[in-house]
Amino acid sequence: MKINLILLDSSLELVPKEIASHPAVIRNARKRNKKPEHTILDISLHYHAMKNLPNWRKRGRPDIVHLALLMFLTEKVPIKGEVYIHTIDGKIIYVNSDMRPPKNYNRFIGLAEQLLLHGQVPINDANPLMKILNIKLTDLKSKYKIGVLSEDGKKVKPEELCNLGENWLLGVGAFPHGDFSEEIKGVADEYFSISNYKLETHQVICRIISACLQQLGWP
């Protein structure tokens, strides 16, 4: 039993050039001794600047990605398959399933900035923890069926997802507001819902992991 996971439309991106000269962005960058466009977009720091961006309510939440990776990767469990991040601007990031994400948020942000600037972390390592792949989301369709977790999807019990098979890639949205992009809608083979209530990204992952481990007889 392996669960392949992809975080979809993830709110993980560098500060776009359109707002790089905004005082809020410059102030944060100076504190960290970095160029504004080399810092991660974060709505808690860049709220006033972001209001000028298209689709801004769906952007600037790298903490969602951080929590999701912590939930899926921290424990040494036998169900971890392939892990990917699909970003809101269409990048596909491969995540080594042996990675132990830093629990400290600021350390994670540093890693994410390095990743988005240089294409992988660590830089020039033959076995990177995370790497931007030169592919599109549609390219993953040749390897997987894609099942998207959505509150409007087909009602299933979490344990049913554990038994789909390793040719399935489970997609969980990693953004705060809004709907999946047309890119996601174009590749989804099936939509699943595991609750009658709206769940946050890390809650969805937690429920699936717990259900799968229970099937395996883990305490």
Swiss-Prot record:
InterPro entries, A to Z: Alpha/beta_knot_MTases, Rbsml_bgen_MeTrfase_EMG1/NEP1, Ribosome_NEP1_arc, tRNA_m1G_MTases_N
Site (Interaction with substrate rRNA): R61, R100, K103, R107
Superkingdom of origin organism: Archaea
Enzyme class: transferase
Keywords: Methyltransferase, Ribosome biogenesis, RNA-binding, rRNA processing, rRNA-binding, S-adenosyl-L-methionine, Transferase
Record-linked Pfam families: EMG1
Site (Stabilizes Arg-61): D63
Residues binding S-adenosyl-L-methionine: G173, G178, I194, S195, N196, Y197, K198, L199
Residues of the signal peptide: none
GO biological process, one term: rRNA base methylation
Entry EC no(s): 2.1.1.-
Catalytic activity: a pseudouridine in rRNA + S-adenosyl-L-methionine = an N(1)-methylpseudouridine in rRNA + S-adenosyl-L-homocysteine + H(+)
Gene3D superfamilies: 3.40.1280.10
GO molecular function, one term: rRNA binding
CDD domains to which the protein is assigned, alphabetical: Nep1-like
HAMAP family named in the record: NEP1
Protein purpose: Methyltransferase involved in ribosomal biogenesis. Specifically catalyzes the N1-methylation of the pseudouridine corresponding to position 914 in M.jannaschii 16S rRNA.
The protein's assembly and partners: Homodimer.
Family to which the UniProt record says this protein belongs: Belongs to the class IV-like SAM-binding methyltransferase superfamily. RNA methyltransferase NEP1 family.
UniProt xrefs under PANTHER family: NEP1/MRA1, RIBOSOMAL RNA SMALL SUBUNIT METHYLTRANSFERASE NEP1
Protein name: Ribosomal RNA small subunit methyltransferase Nep1
